[in-house]
Amino acid sequence: MISELEKKILKSLNENARKSFREVAKEVGTSTTAKYNNVKKMEKRGLLQGYVPAVDEELLGFTLTAIIAMRISQGKLYNVYDKIIKYPEVREIYDLTGEWDAILVCFFKKRRDLDNFLKTKLNLPHIERVMTHVVLNVIKDEKRAFIEAL
């Protein structure tokens, strides 16, 4: 679990990760040194894993998002994961229960790129079946940490 002070620090950073140590310390009611030490402890524990910008993929030219479900031969999940984890188009991989073994979230610039990805990069041994969904609209895409429920 996390302390109340850590929770306050995380909420503050979640609103704006570019805040200075001094700003966050003032906001959460602690000294700059205490805030710094708490952040370092959270990083060491793996609770804070980095600081990355939230980027709009469409502004980078990635206008096509595909959700790809895969059925993989029994016992071969990690053989497939070891390959697809390296593909830059694959932004997220979810290991599932149920009819499908994995879901990929992928970004592409053009339909042709998606077509090529499906026909070449996902043409792997042990991938038995693939079902692709093209995203029409993104209703919610929350990039901030899930802290509000703590």
Question: Where are the regions a protein language model picked out?
Answer:
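A compositional/biophysical signature of low hydrophobicity enriched in polar/charged and small residues
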Residues: 1-150
